[in-house]
């Protein structure tokens, strides 16, 4: 699931939800919804996250296990 990968990547980089929300220019609450599966993640946000973590969108959305 997308939100599990997001949480794992964030924690692997020792970042808080607030850190990532600030980078994405969204509220921490909105990011929390993305990470818990409470909201769908817009493609623009997925692109920014893939760039930030230097990974592919396919990895983020579980289409591959290769980062």
What is the predicted function of each stretch?
Residues 4-23, 48:
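Short basic helix-loop element that most often maps to the first helix and adjoining turn
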């Amino acid at each position: 699931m997308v939100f599990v990968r997001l949480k794992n990547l964030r924690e692997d980089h020792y970042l808080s939800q607030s850190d990532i929300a600030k980078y994405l220019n969204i509220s921490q609450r909105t990011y929390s919804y993305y990470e818990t599966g409470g909201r769908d993640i817009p493609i623009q946000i997925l692109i920014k996250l893939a760039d930030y973590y230097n990974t592919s969108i396919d990895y983020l959305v579980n289409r591959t296990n290769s980062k």
